[in-house]
């Protein structure tokens, strides 16, 4: 039987911080916040995106001159600077108009597969009120989307941010009701009778999602499309050099930045991955008590990053969706010669996994729907086979490494931890 008192003592020792003990201070990181994924750096740390920054700044400046800015849709693979550019320019816009007669407010929404039309407007209202001097209370539930807008959002913008509202919606392809959201935002001035501009910046990693935006939305939104290309290896090096001061002087081996950039460049020039690798390598060195961060630490970090990225991709996924992915990893492990598995095969193993963790399995059609959502988010690939003796059927394949996917699922899903050895 485990000794709970001993376990509690160990936890307390880990959590305790002795301000007079130098051992509690990192010998590696001086400014760790520079490596946080959500950190929006100063302009002099941003690399290779001057044209996009200039375009967006000039476009949004129209809000200050009674002109009508364009709505914007940004396209490009993960880690190409889309979110960074949008958030950087919007932060500067808020700062530039603060204290003027027409301040402008911005909201940033990062949806997941379970985001709804109503929850999106609640989140926008929450963020706007959080920045207001005299905020309104925004209840978490119980109101319609129209009520959130008409009673909790537009009155506050009108009263305190008469220059207008800019809404950034990240990863629009993950939002199940994004067409309705974009349509409503694009018709705000005509339909909701407000006299301030409401501008939308939509961001997507999936260029093919353009075809999923309904024609009525395209017609009212009339967006300016901006395409972000992957970073080159030398640009990734510059991005990391601009964050070198996150570390103490002298702790980075000369090979760390080139190795990190090279690994990130292999993954379509992903700056987000590069910064995460950079940070994780430092954390590994710190945890191991090393005084120098080396290329070996970077390679160790590379394995961990795969798991972290996967956990981000499935964040917000319902339990059944995760169990289906776990079933697919089990099929992959047991059939190393196969890459593609039919829906019926996955569903059969999924039913076993669900019962193993004491969850009632979903039916075939719901499983198919969940698998297709994973295709939308890039976790899975799918293909359809028609004709032949077996008729029509759909097959699925994991996009990422099987073991990283499996580890990420176990780490993010308590119900699966009992199956760790399976």
UniProtKB/Swiss-Prot annotation:
UniProt key word Protein biosynthesis: no
Pfam families: AAA_22, Cdc6_C, Cdc6_lid
The protein's name: ORC1-type DNA replication protein 13
Role played: Involved in regulation of DNA replication.
Highest taxon above the source species: Archaea
PANTHER family: CELL DIVISION CONTROL PROTEIN 6-RELATED, ORC1-TYPE DNA REPLICATION PROTEIN
Annotated HAMAP family: ORC1_type_DNA_replic_protein (MF_01407)
One GO term of the biological process aspect: DNA replication
Organism from which the protein derives: Haloarcula marismortui (strain ATCC 43049 / DSM 3752 / JCM 8966 / VKM B-1809)
Binding site for ATP: 80-84, 231, 243
Keyword list, A-Z: ATP-binding, DNA replication, Nucleotide-binding, Plasmid
SUPFAM superfamilies hit by this protein: P-loop containing nucleoside triphosphate hydrolases, Winged helix' DNA-binding domain
Annotated SMART domains: AAA (SM00382), Cdc6_C (SM01074)
UniProt record similarity statement: Belongs to the CDC6/cdc18 family.
Entry-linked InterPro entries: AAA+_ATPase, AAA_22, Cdc6_C, Cdc6_lid, ORC1/CDC6, Orc1/Cdc6_arc, P-loop_NTPase, WH-like_DNA-bd_sf
GO molecular function annotations of the record: ATP binding; ATP hydrolysis activity
Lineage of origin: Archaea, Methanobacteriati, Methanobacteriota, Stenosarchaea group, Halobacteria
């Amino acid at each position: 039987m485990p000794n709970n008192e001993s376990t509690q003592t160990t936890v307390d020792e880990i959590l305790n911080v002795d301000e007079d003990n130098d051992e509690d201070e990192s010998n590696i990181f001086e400014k760790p916040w520079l490596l946080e994924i959500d950190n929006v750096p100063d302009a002099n740390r941003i690399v290779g995106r001057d044209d996009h920054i200039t375009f967006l700044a000039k476009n949004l400046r129209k809000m200050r001159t009674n002109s009508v800015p364009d709505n914007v849709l940004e396209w490009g693979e993960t880690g190409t600077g889309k979110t960074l550019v949008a958030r950087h320019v919007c932060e500067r816009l808020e700062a530039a108009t603060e204290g003027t007669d027409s301040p402008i407010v911005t909201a940033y929404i990062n949806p997941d597969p379970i985001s709804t039309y109503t929850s999106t407007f609640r989140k926008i209202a929450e963020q706007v009120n959080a920045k207001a001097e005299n905020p309104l209370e925004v209840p978490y539930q119980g109101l319609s989307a129209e009520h959130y807008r008409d009673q909790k959002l537009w009155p506050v913008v009108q009263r305190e941010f008469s220059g207008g509202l800019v809404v950034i919606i990240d990863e629009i392809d993950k939002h199940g009701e994004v067409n309705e959201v974009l349509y409503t935002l694009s018709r705000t001035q005509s339909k909701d009778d407000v006299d301030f501009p409401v501008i939308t910046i939509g961001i997507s990693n999936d260029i093919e999602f353009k075809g999923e935006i309904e024609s009525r939305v395209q017609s009212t939104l009339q967006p300016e499309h901006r395409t972000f290309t992957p970073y080159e290896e030398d640009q990734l090096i510059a991005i990391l050099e601009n964050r070198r001061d996150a570390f103490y002087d002298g702790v980075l081996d000369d090979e760390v930045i080139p190795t990190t950039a090279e690994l990130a460049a292999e993954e379509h020039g992903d700056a987000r991955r590069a910064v995460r690798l950079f940070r994780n390598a430092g954390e590994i060195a710190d945890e191991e008590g090393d005084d120098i961060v080396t290329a070996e630490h970077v390679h160790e970090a590379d394995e961990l990053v795969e798991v972290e990225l996967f956990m981000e991709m499935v964040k917000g996924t319902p339990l059944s969706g995760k169990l289906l992915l776990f079933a697919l990893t089990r099929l992959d492990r047991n059939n190393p010669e196969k890459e593609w598995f039919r829906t019926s095969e996955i569903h059969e193993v999924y039913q076993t996994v669900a019962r193993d963790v004491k969850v009632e399995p979903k039916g075939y059609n719901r499983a198919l729907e969940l698998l297709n959502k994973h295709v939308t988010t890039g976790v899975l690939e799918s293909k359809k086979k028609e004709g032949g003796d077996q008729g029509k059927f759909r097959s699925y394949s994991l996009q990422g490494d099987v073991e990283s996917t499996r580890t990420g699922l176990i780490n993010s899903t308590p119900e699966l931890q009992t199956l760790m050895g399976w």
